[in-house]
Structures are given as C-alpha cells and as structure tokens.
Amino acid sequence: MKKQKGISYKTKGWMIVLLLPITITIYILAIIGWQQLVKIPVVQEWAEIINSSTAKLDVPTEYIELYKKAEDNYGVPWTLLAAHHRIETRFSTMDPLLSPAGAEGHLQFMPCTFVGWSHPSCGGLGKGDIPEKDKISPAIIEQYGGYGVDANNDGKADPYDLEDAIFSAANYLAASGAADGEIEKAVFNYNHSEKYVEDVLHFYHLYESQVKNLQAAAYSSQ
C-alpha cells in the first residue's frame, strides 16, 4: 500500500499567496458592510443598547450632587464642571492643592480671579499679594469683583472648600459664556491654553456620552 503524499511546503506557500488577497478583500467588504449596516435606525438602536449596558460614568459619585447643584444655580453643565475638576486636580487628589504658579484649591483659581482683578495688588499672572483673610472674604470679593462664592453660607468663600470651589468655577464659567452654550470660549477663558481646552473638552464630551448611554440603558430596561 502506497503512502499518500501530503501537500508540499511549496504548494502551501502558493495557496497562502493566492488566498491572502481574497482574505483581505473579504475583510474590507465586511468593514464597509458594517459601516452601511449601522446607518439603519434599528441597528443603531441595537448597537447603542449594547454600548449602554457596559457604560460606566468615570466621575466620583460623591461629587456629582455638588456639580448638579452648581448647574442649577449657574446653568453650566455639571459634566463640564466635572471635566474641569478632573483636569485641574484629578478630582482633588493632587497634593498639595497649590500650583507652582500660585493657583489655589480644588479648581485651581488664581487669587486675583477669585478675589477680583481690581484688587490693588493684582497684575501679571494673577497671584497678587492679597492677605489670607481677604482671600476668603465675601465682602472683599464683592468689592473687587471676583468670582469666589460662599456656596455653603459659612461666611467664607474658600477655594480650598470643595463646595465653594465648584460654585466659584461655575460662576466664572457662566460669566465666560458656558451658560449660554459657548463652552469652548468659556474653557479657554478659564485657562488660555489650546491644550487645556482640548483636554477639558475631551472629558466633557466623554462624560456627556457616558451619561447619555446610562440613561439609554436605564430606559431600555424599563
């Protein structure tokens, strides 16, 4: 009985060479087919539900209520406040909450922005030479037109108090146009850096998307 010969290595090599273009073509057609398929409304809903079921909001839950309270007061999207908080101090995990340039607190305010640029010591980058007691005085802040807010009514507007800092950021962003939908302009006004704007908007859009997906998942489960 003769022993059957297997396919030679040379033949296998030619088979791979011949099949490779076919495989690549099928792969490309599959991608194009999916791109066309996802344009169908029913398929879009199906894909969104799948994405929503695994959605997770990457914001510490203990801060969300404060963001939403500030949104109610100033009309600034709470997801934008969360994005600023993330970029400025990594949700207050930066230690200390003081930058080399002199920005202070949970949302990194320059003292002159917090207290007011009309303060006689203010100029340059805004570090100023403001007495510590005046930095947290609502009366002094009102006098010099600053953005610091006493959100918890304890008699102090303190950038190192989380609630005060979030409300102050919302106040500043609202005055810069965020409450009227001018998000990019407001973010740039907060920090005159294109990279900063890009980073904040990245997280803002991410959180907006995650919230939408979570809402869709909750709705689909009803």
Each model region followed by its residue ranges:
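N-terminal Lys/Arg-rich, disordered targeting/topogenic segments
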Residues: 1-13
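Intrinsically disordered, low-complexity regions enriched in Ser/Pro/Gly/Gln/His and often acidic
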Residues: 5-7, 27, 107
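Hydrophobic membrane-insertion alpha-helices, especially the h-region
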Residues: 14-32
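Catalytic glycan-binding domains that act on GlcNAc-containing polysaccharides
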Residues: 38-222
